[in-house]
Design a protein with these regions (language model features):
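Rossmann-fold NAD(P)-binding glycine/threonine-rich loop
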Residues: 298-316, 334
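Adenosine-nucleotide cofactor-binding segment
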Residues: 198-204, 216-282
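Glycine-rich beta-strand-centered segment in the early N-terminal region that forms part
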Residues: 26-42, 55-106, 110, 161-167
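NAD(P)H dinucleotide-binding glycine-rich loop of Rossmann-like/cofactor-binding domains
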Residues: 100-198, 202
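C-terminal hydrophobic helical "lid"/dimerization subdomain
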Residues: 1-2, 258, 281-285, 326-380
Length: 380
């Protein structure tokens, strides 16, 4: 058992507002298929915020819990059945999957039968409060990386000993396990975009930037980047965006018109990372016949997609859901690292580090849009 600090999420006083606090917790020794990880860094993803700002009972979610699912650290102890990691190995963390269901066996682990329950809910039994023996929901996405120590599932682990040059790279690569992987996979796996494609990307957080860089790698002929923060738009221009739209003063209901002012024929692929209902529906309308819209951003829980069925049928359009970019982390993460070394996936342009106890500042930077990917540092 280890004792360390963690960011504990408690039930919010009102929906949409997180209630996080820096607390001491006790972390159990690893089970047979688990690894005790000393965390070095963890990216903050919008999913961490969404799934700790909803009332208890939503989707089965309970409190208190520790979130965080873009972790990086070093293995301190391993269970007897663990084969992919040895004590002392640096590791990168991603989502959990069972490896035995139909989707896992078909190499689509992000659509694992147990994905929702194991990743979004986690489980009790591996972490408790230092005072009062309060059981804490942990193993969020198999990892709960907003903690100094965490007992993680082997399935969530990518061994990084042959992928990194030093510990600074381990920290830099922490966010590859979700946001960048999701955006990249939306282009690479979900849409299989190529040189003939015209791509619209709404929202330039880590997911959107991952999609943008991968669209450039895929040699898509036109890439339209949309955001409300000018600094992100300026950065997108340097990374391959051929057109940009700033929505800071725009009516979202006219986004389709703005896109068609640039490209009257519309786009072949629209990637929505915002989860804003009006943006989602305008993205769909921006696609031409047989175009694809990929939904990644999480909309309000009660939102129902508004599509005119007859028009949709005649257009041949497709609206696709996307979890983790339909990626296999043990393939996707090494690929993104190689792209980084090749200078075509420069994630260092997006990352800003914060001490773990300064998580409030990191959250503010994300909300303001001044930082694309805040990363919490657990070990300096």
């Amino acid at each position: 058992m280890e004792t360390g600090n963690a960011i504990v999420a408690r039930e919010p006083s009102q929906p949409g507002v997180v209630h996080w606090s820096f607390e001491q917790v006790e972390v159990a020794s690893p089970g047979d298929d688990e690894i005790l990880v000393e965390m070095y860094a963890a990216g903050i993803c919008h999913t961490d915020i969404v799934l700790s700002s909803v009332p208890a009972g939503t989707m089965g979610i309970d409190y208190p819990k520790v979130v965080g699912h873009e972790g990086a650290g070093v293995a301190k102890a391993v269970g007897k059945n663990v084969k992919s990691v040895a004590v002392g190995d640096p590791i990168l963390l991603s989502f959990y999957y069972c490896s035995t269901c139909q989707q896992c066996e078909a190499s689509h682990p992000s659509y694992c039968d147990s994905f929702n329950s194991k990743n979004y809910l986690g489980q009790q039994g591996t972490m408790k409060s230092k005072t009062g023996d309060e059981q804490i929901w942990a193993q969020f996405f198999g990892q709960s990386s907003f903690a100094q120590y965490s007992t993680v599932k082997e399935a969530s682990v990518v061994n990084a000993k042959d992928l990194i040059k030093d510990i600074s790279e381990l920290k830099l690569f922490a966010p590859l396990g979700c946001g960048f992987q999701t955006g990249s996979g939306a282009i690479l796996n979900i849409t299989q975009a190529g040189p003939k494609d015209v791509v619209l990307i709404t929202g330039l957080g880590a997911v959107g930037m991952g999609a943008l860089m991968t669209a450039k790698i895929a040699k898509c002929k036109t890439i339209i980047a949309v955001d409300r923060v000018q600094s992100r738009i300026d950065l997108a221009k340097t990374l391959g965006a051929t057109h940009t739209i700033n929505t800071s003063d725009a009516d979202f209901s006219t986004l389709d018109l703005a896109v068609r002012d640039l490209l009257p024929g519309g786009v072949s692929i629209a990637i929505d990372t915002t989860g804003v209902p009006a943006v989602i529906e305008q993205s769909i309308q921006s696609t031409h016949a047989r175009g694809k819209t990929v939904l990644i951003g999480v909309p309000p829980m009660d939102y129902m997609l508004n599509i005119h069925a007859t028009t949709h049928i005649s257009s041949g359009r497709a609206v696709l859901g996307c979890i983790e970019g339909d990626s296999d982390p043990r393939v996707a993460i090494p690929q993104m690292i190689q792209w980084y070394r090749d200078g075509i996936f420069p994630i260092d342009k997006f990352v800003e580090y914060f001490d773990a106890e300064d998580y409030s500042k990191a959250l503010d930077s994300l909300k303001e849009g001044s930082v694309v990917k805040p990363v919490l540092i657990w070990k300096k």
